[in-house]
C-alpha cells in the first residue's frame, strides 16, 4: 500500500515552513507522494517544486490544476521540466476545468 499527503490549498506565505517540515517527515517515514491544489491566489506547482527540492524520495504533484489559468502546452512543459529536474519524481494529477 502506498500513502500520500494532501497539502491542499493554503496560505503558503504563512505555512511554508510547516508544510515543508511535514513533507520532510513524510519522506523520512516512506510516504510515496505529496499533493497540492490551487485556486486563484496561489498556484499548485510552485510549492511542490520547493518540496521536491527539499526531499529525497517522495514524488509530488498538483492534485488540481486550473486549465483556464494555463495553456495545455505550458502544463506539458512545466510537467516535463519538473520531472527532469526532480529525477522523475513529478506527478501530474487530475486536471480540472471550470464549471460551465
Per-region residue spans from a language model:
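Positions that flank functional sites
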Residues: 41, 66-67
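A short, GP-enriched loop/loop-strand-helix hinge that lies immediately N-terminal to
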Residues: 59-65, 91
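Flexible, glycine-rich active-site loops centered on histidine and acidic residues
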Residues: 2-16, 69-99
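N-terminal beta1-alpha1-beta2 module of alpha/beta enzyme domains
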Residues: 1-61, 98-99
Amino acid at each position: 500500500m502506498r500513502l500520500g499527503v494532501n497539502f491542499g490549498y493554503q496560505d503558503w506565505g504563512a505555512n511554508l515552513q510547516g508544510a515543508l517540515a511535514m513533507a520532510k517527515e513524510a519522506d523520512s517515514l516512506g510516504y510515496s507522494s505529496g499533493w497540492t491544489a490551487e485556486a486563484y491566489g496561489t498556484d499548485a506547482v510552485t510549492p511542490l517544486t520547493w518540496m521536491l527540492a527539499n526531499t529525497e524520495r517522495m514524488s509530488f504533484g498538483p492534485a488540481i490544476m486550473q486549465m483556464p489559468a494555463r495553456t495545455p502546452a505550458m502544463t506539458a512543459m512545466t510537467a516535463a521540466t519538473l520531472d527532469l529536474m526532480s529525477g522523475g519524481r513529478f506527478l501530474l494529477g487530475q486536471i480540472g476545468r471550470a464549471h460551465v
